[in-house]
Amino acid sequence: MIAAAAAALVIGAGTLGGVVGTQLAGSRTSTAGSSTSTAIAVALAAGQTLSTAQVASVVSPSVVTITATGNRQTSEGSGIVLSSNGRILTNNHVVAGSTSRGGRGGPIAIEVTLANGKKANATVVSQDATHDLAVLQASGVSGLTAATIGTGAAVNVGDSVLAFGSPLGLEGTVTAGIVSAVNRSIDSGGSTLTNLIQTDAAINAGNSGGPLVNAAGQVIGINVANATASNGSGSIGVGFAIPVSTAIGMINGNVG
């Protein structure tokens, strides 16, 4: 638990407004040349770890930005592509205000911005408020690059990790760090999230729902929250992600 006197827990998908509401336009897709792609394929086939740049190249096409608009609020977060036809994993709190199931604002609109800059409408197909997870379906999309889910991948303190997402509306952002701790519990919005991965990779408002990945480019967690100093400043190197083991049931149930 985080002591309230020391740090305030901030859910990673901020309400739009002020600087959080200033989303940069344009695509930030990272493409790799043929020689780089071949090197990555060889490394993955051999079970080797990748460089930070290689991991970013592999994972970035599978990360989306989510803008959810309800009657009372608009929130922004990130998501992980689960299938080529547009199934997307994110945090429930990113879309809860825009859905009738558990949302205050009533259903209005959810828009997904893909890694190539294209936009698509989306609907919620599954929610798990207890574990802060949701699965979306993007409309009219095909040929998307699904992320590699690290089912069974070991998560050890000290492992190198990268966090992906759209902090403060900055699409295509990648931050690096390590696994700082495992099995953390935090109090979030009146509920308790358990078995979380703690990382010092920067996680800020807008990162929620984005992937935390290991050095093999496998998704090992879903970014969910960060701790801030009492003055409300940005990342202080204490971020949290829901482990894939918690989400695997929802993933398997929605990707066939």
Which residues fall in each region the model found?
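N-terminal export and membrane-targeting signals
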Residues: 1-9, 15
